[in-house]
Amino acid sequence: MLSSWVRCLGALLFLASVAQAQFQFFEHMFGGGHQEHHQQNTQNSASDSARYQQLWEGTNCNKYLCPGTLACVDFPHHCPCAHPNVEDKVELGEGSAVCISKGGYKPGEAARKIELARKGLL
């Protein structure tokens, strides 16, 4: 008889702990648990262009100021890519250039695909 009470009590404690874990999961998923949330809450940057405009206006350049990187270059097609580790710069031939994702291609493959697309072959 004592053994059945111990089993029953053990099963009840097990079910209670599973239920508690489930409620903590849902509370965390749906915005509860505010104590932890306030510690990790950081201010996101504004979604307007005011910060960019301040940087633009504060940059000294007597040549061409690249809009994507704020680099000062002689000609627009000399602008560097904003993310050179993952982008290739492809000059289009009429004084313009584009930065495209390397996308895991072999070196020069992205430029080749752009050239094929410009010729209507892709």
Swiss-Prot record:
Keyword Lipid biosynthesis carried by entry: no
Superkingdom field: Eukaryota
Signal sequence extent: 1-21
GO terms (BP aspect): ERAD pathway
CDD domains: LCL2-like
Keywords associated with the record: Signal
Entry function: Probable component of the endoplasmic reticulum-associated degradation (ERAD) pathway.
Family from the record: Belongs to the LCL2 family.
Descriptive protein name: Long chronological lifespan protein 2
